[in-house]
Regions:
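Gly/Ser-rich helix-loop-strand patches that form or flank binding pockets
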Residues: 96-134
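Structural beta-alpha unit
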Residues: 72-106
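Small/aliphatic-rich secondary-structure junction motif
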Residues: 1-53, 77
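Aromatic/hydrophobic pocket-lining residues that form π-stacking "cages" and hydrophobic walls in ligand
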Residues: 20, 70, 94, 128
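Active-site-adjacent beta-strand anchor residues
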Residues: 6, 84, 109
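A short acidic, glycine-rich active-site loop
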Residues: 53-65
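Class I S-adenosyl-L-methionine
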Residues: 21, 64, 68-75
């Protein structure tokens, strides 16, 4: 089973990691767990000033701040995982990575907004649900 776990470093995404570590036996024998950090794109004007090499380094650093503690938490619980980052808008990027990687399951936190607030303010989780075919 391939499991995608998008995280952003928030308390809500930490709950996703806790969920995976506490329920590892329910996820099947040797599940393939991939952590994903979606980085917001730097505005075009700024990226021209920064340059591609520095921009890539910036994205690497930002993603590592989020991904490394999660990998360590999973490792401490005996759960193997890989990690990657992608640049883009959160929901469509998560859905795209899930499709490309053949993920069977996406485990992600939710901010716990009410249905009305989610409708009015939007929800990454709801958008991912709407965008995924599986």
């Amino acid at each position: 089973m391939k499991i995608l776990v998008p995280i952003d470093g928030s308390e809500f995404s930490k709950h996703s990691i806790e969920f995976v570590t506490s329920r590892a036996t329910l996820l099947g024998h040797n599940p393939e767990i991939e952590l994903l950090s979606v980085q917001a794109p730097v505005p075009a004007r700024a990226s021209k000033l920064i340059g591609n090499g520095s921009l890539s380094g910036y994205y690497d650093e930002e993603a590592n701040v989020i991904l490394e503690p999660a990998i360590e938490a999973l490792k401490a619980a005996g759960v193997k995982a890989t990690a990657r980052y992608a640049v883009g808008e959160a929901a469509p990027t998560i859905a795209k990575v899930a499709e490309e990687s053949g993920a069977d399951l996406i485990i992600m936190g939710s901010h716990g907004r009410s249905a009305l607030k989610g409708l009015l303010l939007g929800s990454v989780t709801n958008s991912v649900l709407a965008l995924c075919d599986k």
